[in-house]
């Protein structure tokens, strides 16, 4: 029996990364249910749309749908409306056209979709390339499918999903796979100011990709920079358990009561 993969992304349904991994999965005899945004929804994180109704459109008979919402909307509607009671074996988000490392994970719609899948207790993984500059998605999809197959054999811990970044180098030059921790920082942050013909001010938030040379050992940055596939386990539970103990020892609650 074919394994069922739920596929989404944040770059939109026409993204080359989405098409490449979809085709690769079908070639590998997976049943692929694709539910993707109808446009680029990068940077939407884990947001759901509550302020307007959403529309699902079937664009191919072969289980291919688009939604006029965020990646998390696609997962939410795909699982509850399209698949209903049929649970997929795995949820894949990507392949993202650019990295999702370090602080990117807080803003990424690609990562947000994988997190949404995890909330539904579905093994989930977010795939991204190490650079947006001319990625070879055919090579990247080959590497991604190896991880997909491993996920169907080895179980993830409950409440955990994977954030995977694959270097944009020829597949034969990739040095291997590393389990990594999340780094810090991702872009040379900048805000660009524009003036309209009527002299109104506008601002563009963005930044240049900047894999820093001074990366800490063991991070997603370092792995990708050194030619390895970075595999970072991310938990749903964001609680800082060490901080609870520290604040308790510092009598933080007692101090609040005293004031």
Curated annotation (Swiss-Prot):
EC assignment: 3.1.3.5
GO MF annotation terms: 3'-nucleotidase activity; 5'-nucleotidase activity; exopolyphosphatase activity; metal ion binding; nucleotide binding
Reactions mediated catalytically: a ribonucleoside 5'-phosphate + H2O = a ribonucleoside + phosphate
Annotated positions binding a divalent metal cation: 10-11, 42, 96
Gene Ontology, cellular component aspect: cytoplasm
Alphabetized UniProt keyword annotations: Cytoplasm, Hydrolase, Metal-binding, Nucleotide-binding
Family annotation (SUPFAM superfamilies): SurE-like
Main location: cytoplasm
Cellular compartments annotated: Cytoplasm
Textual note on the cofactor: Binds 1 divalent metal cation per subunit.
Cofactor: a divalent metal cation
Top-level class of the enzyme under EC nomenclature: hydrolase
Protein family: Belongs to the SurE nucleotidase family.
Function: Nucleotidase that shows phosphatase activity on nucleoside 5'-monophosphates.
Annotated protein name in UniProt: 5'-nucleotidase SurE
Source species: Sulfurihydrogenibium sp. (strain YO3AOP1)
Higher taxonomy: Bacteria, Pseudomonadati, Aquificota, Aquificia, Aquificales
